[in-house]
Amino acid sequence: MSPERHLRWSLALAALFLAMGLWLEAMIGLRAAGWVDDPLRREFLRLGHAHGGVLALLNVGVAWALGQLETPSAWAGKIRRATLLGALLVGGGFVAGGLTHGPTDPGPPVLVVPAGALMVLGGVVATALVRPGDRVPGGSR
């Protein structure tokens, strides 16, 4: 994935979760039945909006840092994919878990949230630790 594509996808993800926050605020303000009168649904929609938005902005920072730190392209591509997919899994997992919840617990989609969080964490740690001359395990550069 190119640096430009990573930045564009990061900003698109931020716009998506920002729009979701505006929609959620409107639903709360209008007291829309079915959307926000259910406390568990409302909580998980808020979690998805907040986590997705923050992690999308984190991706903007990662996109910038990868260029500034001269991260090798083989590493940078893996990091870009991991952090973007991780942000989508965390935000989307919370939202989908809230929309498909049972009587007392979130729905099964929330199970992807920890995997997404680990992907983002791994990408940020790799961004911090990988140096310009480092090779990707397996010998590719």
Please place each PLM-identified region on the residue numbering.
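Polytopic transmembrane helical bundles with strong interfacial aromatic enrichment
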Residues: 1-141
